[in-house]
């Protein structure tokens, strides 16, 4: 039993490393690779299975969480087609949904939305200041045209799980 608990703890550490990777990759390259979402999903499934084994419970919860991930992808498709979120963001959110109970998932989605909106406001202010300064000074800085939503997703996850 101690071994299972220790393994679950290591899976949470792995999730923290994956979230830090998501922040870096999304900030630096504006991309969240498929391997990252896949590792988040697999570690979440492993964590859930181990938790269910410890509790001697049925594995219905896994099916419900996988269904939730699928429904999140379907619900986010219109946002993707309108350019509101990138595919990597949607896949990461869906993969992370396996980690959350339903109440936690609602909190995660709310926090991620609020943090993402705050990031968007910061980028708007940055671009506005850049525009104002470009009238006075020659600047080689370019405007930021996308929001690295992986930061908001990772921070929302950390606030809920850790």
Q: What function would you assign to each model-found segment?
A:
Residues 1-162:
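A membrane-topology feature that recognizes alpha-helical transmembrane segments
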């Amino acid at each position: 039993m101690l071994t299972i608990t220790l393994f679950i703890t290591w899976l949470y550490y792995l999730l923290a490393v994956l979230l830090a990777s998501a922040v870096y990759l999304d900030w630096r390259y504006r991309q969240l690779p498929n391997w990252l979402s896949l590792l988040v999903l697999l570690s979440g499934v492993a964590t859930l299975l181990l938790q269910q084994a410890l509790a001697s419970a049925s594995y219905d919860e896994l099916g419900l969480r996988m269904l939730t991930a699928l429904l999140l992808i379907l619900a986010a498709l219109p946002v993707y087609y309108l350019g509101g979120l990138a595919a990597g963001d949607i896949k990461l959110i869906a993969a992370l949904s396996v980690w959350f109970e339903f109440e936690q998932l609602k909190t995660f989605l709310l926090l991620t939305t609020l943090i993402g909106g705050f990031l968007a406001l910061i980028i708007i202010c940055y671009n506005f200041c850049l525009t104002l300064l470009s009238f006075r000074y020659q600047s080689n800085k370019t405007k930021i045209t996308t929001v690295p939503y992986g930061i908001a997703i990772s921070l929302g996850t950390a606030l809920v799980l850790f």
